[in-house]
C-alpha cells in the first residue's frame, strides 16, 4: 500500500539530496505566494462537471538547462475524480523558471465516498467519520540520470452537493406540508456505505445569533469597521470575537429543537437539537457544542448534552458522539450504563456530511433526563460552543467568574412532552420523524401544531419559525428558515 498526501504529505525527505538539489518544483498560490503542494481542498461539486487547475512552477537555480518528464502517480483514488497534466515534459533554462498545469476534473454524479485503503473503516469498533480523497504526486523525472526525481503532492476532497429549498403550504387547522424543491443527491444505493445521499431534517427555530467579528490579531479585540471618533466616550468592554475566520465554526447562527413524543410517547421520545454556525466545522475535535437544560425551572441547568469523541489509548478518534451529564458530572442516565449517541445521529457508515459543514445535530433520549418526564416537561435551555482557541459563544448561556457555564437570564424554552411543531415523513403507521430523511425534489414533510405549546415556546434573537437542515447543500445554504407568526391570534400556519 502507498500512503497518500492526506496522511504523509510528500513522503520521506532525503535531506542531503534536498539541500544539494538545484531545481525546485512548487505551486503558485494566491497573491503571488507559493505553496509546496497542489491541494484543491474540499471541493463542493454543484455542477455536472467541476474543473479546477493549479500552476506548478519549476525553478532552475543551476547554470545548465534541465529537462524533466512529467507524470502523475496516484496514491488514493475516488470514483468521479481525475487529474490531468497539460504537458508531458518541461524544459527550464539555466537560472530561470517555467510552468505547467494540473487540472482536477470531478463528475458530480459519479462521485462516491471511498476510504483511503491505508485507513481502517472502524475505530474502537465503530464506523469512523472520514472524507473521500483523490491524491497522489506529480513526478518530475530528470532526463539527466544523475539528478533526483522531484515530487509535488496533489490532493482533493470532492463531494457532490444538493441544491434544495422548500415551500410551506397550509393544509388547514394549523397543519401544513413542506415540499422540497430543487436537486438532491443520489449517488449510489441510498444510505450505502460508499454513497452520497442527500438528507433533510426539520426543527422548531428558537435561536438566532449574529455573526461575530474577527479579532484584531494584535489586541484580541474586534477590528474597527468605521473611522475612530476623535473625541470618544470611555471605551466599553470589548465584545466577543473569533480568533480567525476559520474559527467561526463555533460561532452560533441558529438553534433548533424538536421532539418525537407525538409519534412514540414521552417515555420513548428523543430530543433533537440543531446548531447552525457562521463557518464550516473542519473537525469535531476542535469544537465542542453543549446544550444546557433546566429540568426543574429553578434557573440553573440540571443536564448538559455535549459533543465529544471516543478515544483510543488517550488519542482522539474519528468517532464523534453525544453524551449527557448532570450538574455534578455524572453521566446520564448512570455512570455504569451511559447513553451515547452519534453526533449527527448516525455512524460514519452513513454520510451525514459531518466534516466541513456549517451545521451539526445532537440526539438524546428524554428518559435519560427524568426531570423532563415528571413535573417539568417544559424546560429552559441555552447553547454554548467552544472553539479551537478556547473562544466561547453563548446563546441563552453565560460563563461565571470562575469559568463555569451557567444559564443566562434570557433562555429558550420548549416542551418535550407536547412539542409545538411535529415534523414527519410518510403516511399513517409508516410516519417517522423528519430527521435524516432521504431528500429530493418533491419530498414532503408534514407539519402539525400544538398551539398551546407553540405560544409558550420562547425564542432568543429572532422570531419563531421552522429550521430546515439540508445536510448536503453547499456550505452557507445548509440551514434555511421559514418564519412563522407568534400564534397569539390562534394562527401559526395559514
Language model features with spans:
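Short beta-strand and strand-turn-strand segments in soluble, beta-rich domains
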Residues: 74-89, 110-114, 333-347
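Intrinsically disordered, low-complexity Pro/Gly/Ser/Thr-rich segments with frequent PxxP/GP/PP motifs
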Residues: 81-125
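Short solvent-exposed strand-capping/beta-turn motif centered on an Asx-Ser/Thr pair
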Residues: 58-64, 75, 143-145, 278-280
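Short acidic, flexible loop segments centered on an aromatic residue
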Residues: 61-80, 289-295
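Surface-exposed extracytoplasmic segments
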Residues: 185-220, 237-493
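Beta-sheet-dominated interaction scaffolds and their linkers
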Residues: 15-62, 87-92, 119-125, 164-190
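Buried hydrophobic-core signal for structured, non-transmembrane domains
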Residues: 9, 52-60, 102, 136-141
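Terminal connector regions
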Residues: 107-163
Amino acid at each position: 500500500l502507498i500512503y497518500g498526501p492526506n496522511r504523509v504529505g510528500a513522503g520521506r525527505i532525503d535531506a542531503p539530496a534536498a539541500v544539494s538539489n538545484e531545481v525546485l518544483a512548487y505551486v503558485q498560490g494566491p497573491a503571488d505566494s507559493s505553496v509546496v503542494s497542489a491541494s484543491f481542498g474540499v471541493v463542493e461539486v454543484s455542477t455536472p462537471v467541476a474543473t479546477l487547475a493549479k500552476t506548478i512552477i519549476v525553478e532552475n537555480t543551476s547554470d545548465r538547462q534541465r529537462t524533466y518528464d512529467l507524470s502523475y502517480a496516484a496514491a488514493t483514488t475516488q470514483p468521479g475524480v481525475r487529474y490531468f497534466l497539460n504537458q508531458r515534459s518541461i524544459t527550464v533554462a539555466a537560472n530561470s523558471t517555467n510552468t505547467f498545469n494540473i487540472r482536477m476534473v470531478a463528475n458530480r454524479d459519479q462521485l462516491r465516498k471511498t476510504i483511503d485503503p491505508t485507513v481502517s473503516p472502524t475505530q474502537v469498533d465503530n464506523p469512523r467519520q472520514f472524507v473521500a480523497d483523490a491524491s497522489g504526486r506529480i513526478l518530475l523525472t530528470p532526463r539527466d540520470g544523475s539528478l533526483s526525481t522531484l515530487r509535488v503532492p496533489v490532493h482533493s476532497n470532492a463531494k457532490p452537493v444538493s441544491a434544495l429549498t422548500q415551500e410551506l403550504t397550509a393544509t388547514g387547522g394549523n397543519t401544513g406540508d413542506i415540499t422540497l424543491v430543487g436537486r438532491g443527491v443520489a449517488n449510489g444505493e441510498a444510505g450505502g456505505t460508499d454513497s452520497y445521499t442527500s438528507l433533510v431534517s426539520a426543527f422548531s427555530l428558537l435561536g438566532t445569533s449574529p455573526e461575530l467579528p474577527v479579532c484584531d490579531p494584535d489586541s484580541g479585540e474586534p477590528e474597527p469597521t468605521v473611522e475612530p471618533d476623535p473625541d470618544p466616550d470611555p471605551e466599553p468592554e470589548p465584545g466577543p470575537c473569533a480568533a480567525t475566520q476559520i474559527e467561526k465554526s463555533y460561532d452560533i447562527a441558529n438553534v433548533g429543537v424538536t421532539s418525537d413524543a407525538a409519534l412514540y410517547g414521552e417515555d420513548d421520545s428523543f430530543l433533537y437539537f440543531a446548531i447552525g454556525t457562521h463557518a464550516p466545522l473542519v473537525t469535531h475535535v476542535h469544537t465542542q457544542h453543549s446544550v444546557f437544560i433546566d429540568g426543574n425551572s429553578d434557573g440553573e441547568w440540571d443536564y448538559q448534552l455535549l459533543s465529544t469523541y471516543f478515544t483510543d489509548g488517550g488519542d482522539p478518534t474519528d468517532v464523534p458522539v453525544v453524551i449527557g451529564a448532570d450538574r455534578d458530572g455524572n453521566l446520564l442516565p448512570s455512570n455504569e450504563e451511559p447513553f451515547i449517541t452519534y453526533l449527527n445521529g448516525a455512524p460514519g457508515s452513513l454520510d451525514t456530511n459531518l466534516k466541513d459543514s456549517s451545521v451539526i445535530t445532537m440526539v438524546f433520549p428524554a428518559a435519560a433526563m427524568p426531570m423532563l418526564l415528571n413535573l417539568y416537561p417544559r424546560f429552559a435551555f441555552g447553547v454554548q460552543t467552544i472553539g479551537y482557541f478556547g473562544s466561547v459563544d453563548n446563546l441563552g448561556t453565560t460563563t461565571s467568574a470562575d469559568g463555569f457555564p451557567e444559564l443566562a437570564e434570557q433562555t429558550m424554552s420548549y416542551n418535550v412532552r407536547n412539542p409545538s411543531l411535529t415534523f414527519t415523513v410518510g403516511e399513517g403507521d409508516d410516519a417517522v420523524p423528519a430527521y435524516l430523511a432521504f431528500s429530493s425534489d418533491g419530498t414532503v414533510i408534514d407539519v402539525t401544531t400544538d398551539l398551546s405549546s407553540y405560544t409558550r415556546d420562547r425564542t432568543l434573537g429572532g422570531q419563531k419559525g421552522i429550521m430546515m437542515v439540508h445536510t448536503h447543500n453547499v456550505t452557507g445554504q445548509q440551514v434555511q428558515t421559514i418564519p412563522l407568526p407568534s400564534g397569539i391570534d390562534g394562527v401559526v400556519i395559514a
